[in-house]
C-alpha cells in the first residue's frame, strides 16, 4: 500500500516538512524555544528600555531575584589634621518576582504540514512571538507608568483629562500639544521638560529613552524643527524594537509602541526614563509537542514567564497630552 505521507528527510529541524509518527524526531523543542525567544527579543520595546541583567537568574515561575540597591555615599570637605566624617553603609533589598505568565498553543495538521509550500514553523513561531511581545510590553509598560514618582519628586506631567492647557505643570489638566489651531505646547518642548526633570535628579544622560504612541509621533513630525524628517533619519524607517531614529532627540533614544495603555480622557500619554529605572526578567520557560487526540496533527504549546520591578521611580517621567 502506498504511503500518503512521505517520511521526512529534514535534518535541520524544519517543522514544516515533517510529520509526527513518521520521521519527526528532527523537530527539537529546545531549538523551537530558542527560535521563539529570538523573534521576541527583536520585537520587544521593553527589552530595549529596561535592565535585563537578571534574566539569566530565573528558571521557573515564582522565582524571586533579590537586588541590592546601590548605597548613596556622602562627600565632605577635608581640612588638614582634622577628623573626617564617615558614611554608614545601609543596603536596601528589592525583589524582582517572576509572577506573570502567558502561553501559546496551536495545532499543525499533518496534511497542511506536508502538502503546503508554507513553512508553518516559521509562520507560527513569528505569530506566537509577536503575540507574547504585545502582552509582555503592554503589561510592563503599564507597571512602569504606575511606578513613576508622583511626589518628591513629582514626575507626572498633567493628568488623564480632556481639559488641557499649555503650562506643562503637574496639575489636573493634560498638556495641550500644538495642533491645527496654532496654539499649545510644541512636542519637542514637552520632551525638553521631561529631560530637565531627569536632569534635576542627576539621572545619567547615557541610557535615556523616550516611548510614545503613533499619535504623538504624528505631532512630533509636524514640529517646527522637523527633526524627525526623512532627511534627519538618513532615509531609514523604523529600525528594530520600535526604535524610530538612528540619532537621539533631546538626549533620548526614541521608541514607538502601540502597547501603551489607552487613556480615558486625554488623547494619549508618553514616558521617558533611564534604562536603570526598571528591572525585568523573562524567558520562554518550556515548549512541548504532543499529538492532538482529536485530529491528525501536532499540538505545539509554550509558556512565557516574566516579572518587572520599578527600582528607581525618580528615573521615570510621564506626561498626558491632548491633540486638538
Region spans (language model):
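Short Gly/aromatic-enriched secondary-structure transition segments
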Residues: 80-87
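Short, catalytically relevant binding-site loops at active-site mouths
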Residues: 146, 215-219, 260-262
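Sequence/fold signature of self-assembling virion shell proteins
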Residues: 2-51, 56-74, 95-97, 115, ...
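Structured, hydrophobic secondary-structure cores that serve as assembly/anchoring elements
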Residues: 61-66, 72, 85, 92-120, ...
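Generic detector of well-ordered alpha-helical segments enriched in charged/polar residues
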Residues: 28-29, 33-37, 41, 141, ...
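Alpha-helical scaffold segments that mediate packing/assembly in large oligomeric complexes
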Residues: 111-196, 320-324
Amino acid at each position: 500500500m502506498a504511503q500518503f505521507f512521505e517520511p521526512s528527510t529534514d535534518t535541520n529541524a524544519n517543522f514544516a516538512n515533517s510529520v509526527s509518527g513518521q520521521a519527526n524526531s528532527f523537530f527539537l523543542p529546545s531549538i523551537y524555544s530558542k527560535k521563539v525567544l529570538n523573534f521576541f527579543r527583536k520585537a520587544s520595546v521593553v527589552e530595549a528600555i529596561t535592565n535585563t541583567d537578571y534574566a539569566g537568574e530565573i528558571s521557573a515561575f515564582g522565582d524571586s531575584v533579590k537586588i541590592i540597591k546601590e548605597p548613596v555615599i556622602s562627600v565632605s570637605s577635608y581640612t588638614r589634621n582634622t577628623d573626617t566624617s564617615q558614611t554608614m553603609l545601609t543596603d536596601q533589598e528589592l525583589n524582582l518576582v517572576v509572577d506573570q505568565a502567558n502561553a501559546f498553543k496551536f495545532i499543525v495538521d499533518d496534511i497542511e504540514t506536508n502538502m503546503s509550500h508554507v513553512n508553518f514553523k516559521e509562520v507560527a513561531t513569528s505569530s506566537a512571538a509577536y503575540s507574547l511581545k504585545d502582552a509582555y510590553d503592554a503589561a510592563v509598560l503599564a507597571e512602569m507608568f504606575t511606578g513613576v514618582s508622583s511626589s518628591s519628586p513629582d514626575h507626572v506631567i498633567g493628568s488623564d483629562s480632556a481639559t488641557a492647557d499649555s503650562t506643562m505643570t503637574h496639575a489636573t489638566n493634560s498638556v495641550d500639544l500644538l495642533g491645527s489651531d496654532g496654539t499649545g505646547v510644541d512636542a519637542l518642548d514637552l520632551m525638553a521638560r521631561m529631560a530637565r526633570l531627569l536632569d534635576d535628579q542627576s539621572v545619567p544622560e547615557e541610557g535615556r529613552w523616550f516611548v510614545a504612541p503613533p499619535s504623538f509621533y504624528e505631532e512630533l513630525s509636524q514640529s517646527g524643527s522637523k527633526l524627525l524628517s526623512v532627511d534627519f533619519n538618513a532615509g531609514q524607517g523604523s529600525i528594530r524594537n520600535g526604535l524610530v531614529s538612528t540619532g537621539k532627540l533631546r538626549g533620548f533614544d526614541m521608541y514607538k509602541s502601540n502597547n501603551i495603555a489607552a487613556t480615558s480622557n486625554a488623547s494619549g500619554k508618553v514616558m521617558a526614563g533611564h534604562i536603570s529605572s526598571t528591572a525585568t526578567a523573562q524567558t520562554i520557560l518550556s515548549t512541548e509537542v504532543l499529538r492532538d487526540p482529536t485530529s491528525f496533527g501536532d499540538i505545539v504549546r509554550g509558556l512565557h514567564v516574566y516579572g518587572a520591578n520599578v527600582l528607581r521611580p525618580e528615573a521615570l517621567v510621564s506626561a498626558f497630552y491632548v491633540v486638538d
